[in-house]
């Protein structure tokens, strides 16, 4: 089946279940399956998808049809100015949380070395975004979930900040006495 037909059928399928952005989500899923940017897919709209990839596409589409968030299906979410890997072990970074970055940056002078504490780090998107903006700073990021810490460590490494963040798998109440 060619890309244009896949997009047409996929978006129609998602629209039946009142998925908010059926066309975009279908394109994003096709992009994941083909490992191509959306623009490249649209420029090659008559390319065919092989049967194995078509099955993968259909499985992802069914997950989206069942209202699984597109970010969990894709395995990433953009936050602030960066791409963060995510999975079901962490919450999906929300656009309104970017306000926290804006406000925090007002209190972190660009030329000063400060220490940041990120409690409940999850994907690490907040601490990584802050350190990208304030390279002289360092941080400690804590989370009760070992799986979340692993996701955050992966994101720190992805953004080449693994040496600037001390990750601790601990409950906040225990951290007080730990520190």
Where in the sequence are the language-model features?
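Conserved AdoMet
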Residues: 32-107
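A short N-terminal interaction module
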Residues: 1-57
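A general secondary-structure junction signal
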Residues: 28, 77, 169-171
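A general structural signal for well-ordered alpha-helical segments in protein cores
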Residues: 7, 26-27, 57, 67-70, ...
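Conserved SAM/SAH cofactor-binding pocket of Class I
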Residues: 98-179
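Short beta->alpha junction loops/turns
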Residues: 19, 89-90, 131, 145
């Amino acid at each position: 089946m060619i890309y244009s037909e896949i997009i047409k059928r996929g978006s129609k399928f998602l629209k039946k279940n009142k998925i908010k952005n059926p066309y975009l989500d279908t394109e994003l899923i096709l992009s994941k399956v083909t490992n191509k940017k959306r623009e490249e897919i649209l420029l090659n709209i008559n390319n065919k998808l092989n049967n194995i990839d078509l099955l993968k596409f259909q499985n992802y589409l069914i997950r989206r049809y069942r209202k699984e968030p597109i970010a969990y299906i894709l395995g990433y979410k953009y936050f602030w100015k960066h791409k963060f890997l995510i999975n079901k072990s962490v919450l999906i970074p929300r656009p309104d949380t970017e306000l926290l970055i804006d406000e925090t940056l007002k209190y972190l002078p660009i030329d000063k070395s400060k220490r940041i504490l990120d409690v409940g780090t999850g994907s690490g998107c907040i601490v990584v975004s802050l350190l990208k903006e304030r390279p002289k700073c360092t941080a400690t990021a804590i989370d009760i979930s070992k799986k979340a810490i692993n996701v955050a460590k992966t994101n720190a490494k992805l953004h080449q900040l693994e040496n600037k963040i001390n990750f601790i798998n601990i409950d906040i109440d225990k951290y007080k006495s730990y520190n």
